[in-house]
């Protein structure tokens, strides 16, 4: 009775099966959510390359330019296309980074506003309770200092985006 070849792995090392499983689950999730995993320009390029009749070109030898590569007329045109794509990607990256920073600043502002609002509500409730307990109906001069509650002094200089 033979056991077959044994495979040993270091602790924490992923096997090929785990990687294939995670890749398969990622592909399934992408298909389920109907996400596009390729840039439109890449899809255009593949369509451009696949639209050429490679078999017909091989069957009938036409004088093809000496620099024709992968659907481009020359290496220079391929490099120019690549440069344009990289510039577009850079511009998109800058746009997304700016949008992310604006969202982060807005989120931070909303959090500070919420904390200020909650603190003000806490002070108002506690002050009302103290007025009802004392029965005088007059607001207290130092609001609830003996309970450890003070008004918050929130200034924009105390908070940063980092």
From Swiss-Prot:
Protein's name according to its UniProt entry: Protein FAM167B
Pfam families the record matches: FAM167
Domain of life from the UniProt record: Eukaryota
Listed InterPro entries: FAM167 (IPR024280), FAM167_domain (IPR051771)
Family: Belongs to the FAM167 (SEC) family.
Gene name for this UniProt entry: Fam167b
Organism of provenance: Mus musculus
